[in-house]
Swiss-Prot record:
Residues 1-16 have a biased composition (Acidic residues). It comes from the Eukaryota. SMART domains: DEXDc, HELICc. The Q motif is unique to and characteristic of the DEAD box family of RNA helicases and controls ATP binding and hydrolysis. This is ATP-dependent RNA helicase SUB2. It comes from Phaeosphaeria nodorum (strain SN15 / ATCC MYA-4574 / FGSC 10173) (Glume blotch fungus). Residues 21-38 have a biased composition (Low complexity). The keyword ATP-binding applies. One of its GO terms (molecular function) is mRNA binding.
Length: 438
């Protein structure tokens, strides 16, 4: 059965996308279509936004104060294009490369539309993502931007924690969150058992939507939850990578969605990120990694491996070599995983060894070096991994170890997928000025 066949469908007339170019041109945005290129295909363009401030979005004073407190001055490309549309209540399907602040788009847009005095015991916003760590991070983003909205309550729900605590929280009007953040499995269980009621939901958001809708189990959970929500609501979906097939799946959940693609699909490059590869034998990886960590200047570094076993072993080896390392993978208990993620984010450790569980959406501002100790198996996974460095327009460095013919094939696929050439890392290294912000 295809993705489309088992999803809620709307009539063909309702699924007419409006595509907005990412060029900051309000008139073009109102026209709703990206200009076609010579081949007749509609594409967006990548243009930096420096003149517009968050105040121009006419956000609530409480949100503007929170934005100022966070130190943000100018919206990124994706924020500039998407926030004005999202706060009007339009359904939104947005693809934008890693590090451009997609989370802030739906956080600000939904908070802007909330009542000043939200009704106690009623959930009006639901945000789902595919990992517990990302759910935890999104919850924190809501708390950060809602700091001057004292009546707003945010709750996070995910598997691996006692469901009794969730039920207790939801059973009391005084503690029941207005904003529900979580993973599909736990949210669906709470909805199915009638502990969480979504009859008054106004906003339905999926972050890293392709990851959830591409996995049958998660997709089934998402659909079951969707059926428990009102027909009239705002639906927003975000990801750094959206294939044409997944776009079609996403739009099955939407009515007349506004499609926003910041940068066209062939240019999902990360501006400011220096990318290299190192060709070596498998047995040479540890020595080369040691050399890089000794010689590179970095704030924090994330190292990706292919399995939980390799993650544990490499973390142990690094600590034996006196490198301040921690490991994050699915084999670690939930509470310990959150604890390690928090410690890394708070700069208590400078090196994190991880599987792909850390490869999507997780935002640690100080990471400026990403190393693929093991190459990913797909080009899109590469984008999400190296996107951990050079977040939000800052500089960064990625180095990928290529040790087999399969690795070489993936490297070639990455270069073809993103129309980019990744050079070999110079034997004498590179200047830290090329990947370190002043």
């Amino acid at each position: 059965m295809s993705h489309e066949e088992d999803l809620i469908d709307y009539s063909d007339e309702e699924i007419q996308p409006t595509e907005v170019p990412a060029n900051g041109d309000a008139a073009a945005a109102k026209g709703g279509l990206a200009a076609p290129d010579a081949s007749g295909e509609k594409k967006g363009s990548y243009v930096g936004i420096h003149s517009t401030g968050f105040r121009d979005f006419l956000l609530k004073d409480e949100l503007v104060r929170a934005i100022t407190d966070c130190g943000f001055e100018h919206p990124s490309e994706v924020q500039q294009v998407t926030i004005p549309q999202a706060i009007l209540g339009n359904d939104v399907l947005c693809q934008a490369k890693s590090g451009l602040g997609k989370t802030a788009v739906f956080v600000l847009a939904t908070l802007q539309q909330m009542d000043e005095k939200p009704e106690p015991g009623v959930a009006s916003i639901l945000v789902m993502c595919h990992t517990r760590e990302l759910a935890y991070q999104i919850r924190n983003e809501y708390n950060r931007f809602a700091k001057f909205l004292p009546d707003v309550k945010v709750g996070v729900f995910y598997g691996g924690t006692p469901v009794a605590k969730d039920i207790e929280l939801l059973s009391n009007k005084d503690t029941h969150p207005h904003i529900i953040v979580g993973t599909p499995g736990r949210i669906n269980a709470l909805v199915r058992d009638r502990h969480l009621r979504l009859a008054n939901l106004k906003h339905f958001v999926l972050d890293e939507c392709d990851k959830m809708l591409d996995q049958p189990d998660m997709r089934n959970d998402v659909q079951a939850i969707f059926r428990a929500t009102p027909a009239h609501k705002q639906v927003m979906m975000f990801s750094a990578t959206l294939s044409k097939e997944i776009r079609a799946v996403c739009k099955k959940f939407m009515q007349n969605p506004l499609e926003i693609y910041v940068d066209d699909e062939k240019k999902l490059t990360l501006h400011g990120l220096q990318q290299f590869y190192v060709k070596l034998d498998e047995r040479e990886k540890n020595r080369k990694l040691n050399d890089l960590l000794d010689n590179l200047e970095f704030n924090q570094v994330i190292i990706f491996v292919r399995s939980t076993l390799r993650c544990t072993e490499l973390d142990k080896l690094l600590r034996e070599c006196n490198f301040p390392s921690t490991a994050v993978h699915s084999g670690i208990g939930q509470e310990e995983r959150i604890k390690r993620y928090k410690e890394f984010k708070e700069f208590q450790t400078r090196i994190c060894v991880s599987t792909d569980i850390f490869g999507r959406g997780i935002d640690v501002e100080r990471i400026n070096v990403a190393i693929n100790y093991d190459m990913p198996d797909k080009a899109d996974a590469y984008l999400h991994r190296v996107g951990r460095a050079g977040r939000f327009g800052t500089k960064g460095l990625s180095i990928s170890f290529v040790s087999s013919q399969d690795d070489e094939a993936v490297l070639k696929a990455i270069e073809e997928r993103f129309a980019a050439e990744i050079p070999e890392f110079p034997e004498d290294g590179i200047s830290s000025a090329s990947y370190m912000d002043n």
